[in-house]
């Protein structure tokens, strides 16, 4: 069925205007993002094909632009729009979660970063910056690539911590393999960060390694 064959009230844009965004199905939301179909297929048909490709809508956030382009009817332009919408939603979610979040234990912090780090294909070194009440005041990815002591320099981490007037920091990095077991380099980086924090008066509360749906707290394991 082509889009002009659908009744006006059932078209995604008109449905949104009449009933609100919550009334739209996931396929209809995707249809609004990609905007147009092809000569032979409606935008809703293509959008539904995208939804069916993944086990659930949440899986879309881990797809690459190339994976979206494997769907018949999706080229680079439409795939880019989908990726942009997903990334915008992710960033909004980060800001919302960050507001007045108090970190009382490693699990609190992991809930904040796990969605972002668990399924990345490269190692990312990420920091949370906290105030004296252990509230998250800022977060940032500091390094991307293999974690080693020559790349992760405490100077870069604590320069930002001082700029944000942080009282303490929590560091994270992911293991793309999914296994959060620390390497010797992980432990060396942690030791250097803890020592630098003691010098500048900003405590390293923890260094947590993120795997696929699991993590290891180096503080809890007694590594520093």
Swiss-Prot record:
<keyword id="KW-0482">Metalloprotease</keyword>
<comment type="similarity">
    <text>Belongs to the UPF0758 family.</text>
</comment>
<dbReference type="InterPro" id="IPR046778">
    <property type="entry name" value="UPF0758_N"/>
</dbReference>
<dbReference type="InterPro" id="IPR020891">
    <property type="entry name" value="UPF0758_CS"/>
</dbReference>
<dbReference type="GO" id="GO:0006508">
    <property type="term" value="P:proteolysis"/>
</dbReference>
<feature type="binding site">
    <location>
        <position position="175"/>
    </location>
    <ligand>
        <name>Zn(2+)</name>
    </ligand>
</feature>
<dbReference type="GO" id="GO:0046872">
    <property type="term" value="F:metal ion binding"/>
</dbReference>
<keyword id="KW-0479">Metal-binding</keyword>
<dbReference type="InterPro" id="IPR037518">
    <property type="entry name" value="MPN"/>
</dbReference>
<keyword id="KW-0862">Zinc</keyword>
<protein>
    <recommendedName>
        <fullName>UPF0758 protein Lm4b_01560</fullName>
    </recommendedName>
</protein>
<feature type="binding site">
    <location>
        <position position="173"/>
    </location>
    <ligand>
        <name>Zn(2+)</name>
    </ligand>
</feature>
<dbReference type="InterPro" id="IPR025657">
    <property type="entry name" value="RadC_JAB"/>
</dbReference>
<keyword id="KW-0378">Hydrolase</keyword>
<feature type="binding site">
    <location>
        <position position="186"/>
    </location>
    <ligand>
        <name>Zn(2+)</name>
    </ligand>
</feature>
<dbReference type="GO" id="GO:0008237">
    <property type="term" value="F:metallopeptidase activity"/>
</dbReference>
<dbReference type="Pfam" id="PF04002">
    <property type="entry name" value="RadC"/>
</dbReference>
<feature type="domain" description="MPN">
    <location>
        <begin position="102"/>
        <end position="224"/>
    </location>
</feature>
<keyword id="KW-0645">Protease</keyword>
<dbReference type="InterPro" id="IPR001405">
    <property type="entry name" value="UPF0758"/>
</dbReference>
<dbReference type="InterPro" id="IPR010994">
    <property type="entry name" value="RuvA_2-like"/>
</dbReference>
<dbReference type="Pfam" id="PF20582">
    <property type="entry name" value="UPF0758_N"/>
</dbReference>
<feature type="short sequence motif" description="JAMM motif">
    <location>
        <begin position="173"/>
        <end position="186"/>
    </location>
</feature>
């Amino acid at each position: 069925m082509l889009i002009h064959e659908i009744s006006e009230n059932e078209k995604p844009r008109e449905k949104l205007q009449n009933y609100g965004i919550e009334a739209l199905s996931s396929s209809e939301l995707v249809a609004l993002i990609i905007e147009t179909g092809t000569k032979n297929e409606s935008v809703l048909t293509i959008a539904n094909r995208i939804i069916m490709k993944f086990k659930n809508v949440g899986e879309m956030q881990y797809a690459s632009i190339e994976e979206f382009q494997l769907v018949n009817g999706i080229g680079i332009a439409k795939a880019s729009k989908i990726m942009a919408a997903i990334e915008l939603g992710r960033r909004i979610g980060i800001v919302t979660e960050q507001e007045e979040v108090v970190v009382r234990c490693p699990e609190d912090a992991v809930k904040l970063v796990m969605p972002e780090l668990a399924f990345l294909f490269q190692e990312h070194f990420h920091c949370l910056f906290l105030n004296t009440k252990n509230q998250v005041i800022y977060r940032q990815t500091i390094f991307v690539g293999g974690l080693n002591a020559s790349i992760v320099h405490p100077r870069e981490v604590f320069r930002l911590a001082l700029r944000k007037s942080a009282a303490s920091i929590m560091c994270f990095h992911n293991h793309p393999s999914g296994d959060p077991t620390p390497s010797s380099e992980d432990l060396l980086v942690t030791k250097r960060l803890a020592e630098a924090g003691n010098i500048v008066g900003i405590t390293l509360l923890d260094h947590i390694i993120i795997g696929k749906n699991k993590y290891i707290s180096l503080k809890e394991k007694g590594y520093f």
